[in-house]
């Protein structure tokens, strides 16, 4: 696969699971002879939700919840066919969303 790069974008709510999956992908790619750029940490998306604590009164009493989405970016430069096969067979954690672009 001459001159072609694989860009992998990972998303997860838990950064520990995300980092473990990233390490697993990097070690698999390096083991098969590909060059890896990254992991590059992308900005964390924070969604905040504000709700009333009570159902009817006390508008001043509110509670805030937040949801953090952590992201990482990996570039695999000049992947070998063995690299592609190993990445296809790789089993990652359930809470990690993987987007792959060629």
Swiss-Prot record:
GO biological process assignments: translation
Recorded GO CC terms: ribonucleoprotein complex; ribosome
Assembly and oligomerization: Part of the 30S ribosomal subunit.
Listed PROSITE patterns: RIBOSOMAL_S10 (PS00361)
Entry-linked PANTHER family: 30S RIBOSOMAL PROTEIN S10 FAMILY MEMBER
Protein name: Small ribosomal subunit protein uS10
Function: Involved in the binding of tRNA to the ribosomes.
Family named by the database record: Belongs to the universal ribosomal protein uS10 family.
Gene (UniProt): rpsJ
Matches recorded under Pfam families: Ribosomal_S10
SUPFAM superfamilies to which the protein is assigned, alphabetical: Ribosomal protein S10
Organismal lineage: Bacteria, Pseudomonadati, Pseudomonadota, Alphaproteobacteria, Hyphomicrobiales
Entry keywords, A to Z: Ribonucleoprotein, Ribosomal protein
Superkingdom, taxonomy of origin: Bacteria
Gene Ontology molecular-function annotations: structural constituent of ribosome; tRNA binding
């Amino acid at each position: 696969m001459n001159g072609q790069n694989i860009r992998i974008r990972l998303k997860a709510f838990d950064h520990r699971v995300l980092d473990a999956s990233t390490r697993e992908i990097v070690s698999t790619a390096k083991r098969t002879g590909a060059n890896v750029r990254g992991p590059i940490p992308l900005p964390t998306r924070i969604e905040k939700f504000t709700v009333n604590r009570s159902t009817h009164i006390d508008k001043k009493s509110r509670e805030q919840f937040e949801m953090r989405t952590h992201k990482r970016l990996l570039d695999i430069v000049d992947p070998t066919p063995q690299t592609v096969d190993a990445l296809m067979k790789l089993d990652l954690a359930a809470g990690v969303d993987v987007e792959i672009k060629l």
